[in-house]
């Protein structure tokens, strides 16, 4: 039987006959007709997880608070008092809506100074 003959035979089937055919194929080959739809949904979820903007959040200043305050001033351009207040009131966002590269750079500087940082 050629592909064209199979397609012609399928075209002539009723909905009930097509349903039975699908069930028979699923049982014969151990597959489900719903699997491709589920796989497409999972792939769509993976695309949504791909973020383009990140927030860098200072979770803790750690033991060397002075170094962290200096790093925060350098990163944000804040004055000494504002940077100290931000560090004292952690967890606080340091940078919001930045690229992945910038977020990793900021995270590296803060962790180097002794801070605990989270990128969201």
From Swiss-Prot:
Can you supply a Gene Ontology BP term from the record? Answer: translation
One Pfam family matching this protein: Ribosomal_L12_N
Carries keyword Ribonucleoprotein? yes
GO CC terms in record: cytosolic large ribosomal subunit
The protein's UniProt keywords, in alphabetical order, are: Ribonucleoprotein, Ribosomal protein
Report biased composition (Basic and acidic residues) as residue ranges: 95-112
Q: Which InterPro entries match?
A: Ribosomal_bL12, Ribosomal_bL12_C, Ribosomal_bL12_C/ClpS-like, Ribosomal_bL12_oligo, Ribosomal_bL12_oligo_N_sf
Extract the SUPFAM superfamilies matched here. Answer: ClpS-like (SSF54736), Ribosomal protein L7/12, oligomerisation (N-terminal) domain (SSF48300)
Q: Which GO terms describe its molecular function?
A: mRNA binding; structural constituent of ribosome
Provide the function of this protein: Forms part of the ribosomal stalk which helps the ribosome interact with GTP-bound translation factors. Is thus essential for accurate translation.
Q: Which family does it belong to?
A: Belongs to the bacterial ribosomal protein bL12 family.
The molecule here is called: Large ribosomal subunit protein bL12
Query: What gene name is listed for this protein?
Result: rplL
């Amino acid at each position: 039987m050629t592909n064209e003959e199979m397609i012609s035979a399928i075209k002539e089937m009723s909905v009930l006959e097509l349903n039975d055919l699908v069930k028979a194929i699923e049982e014969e080959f151990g597959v489900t007709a719903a699997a491709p739809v589920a796989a497409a949904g999972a792939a769509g979820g993976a695309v949504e997880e791909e973020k383009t903007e990140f927030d860098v959040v200072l979770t803790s200043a750690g033991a060397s608070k002075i170094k962290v305050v200096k790093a925060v001033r350098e990163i944000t351009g804040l004055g000494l008092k504002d940077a100290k207040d931000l560090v004292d009131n952690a967890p606080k966002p340091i940078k919001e809506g930045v690229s992945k590269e910038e977020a990793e750079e900021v995270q590296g500087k803060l962790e180097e100074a002794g801070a605990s940082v989270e990128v969201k």
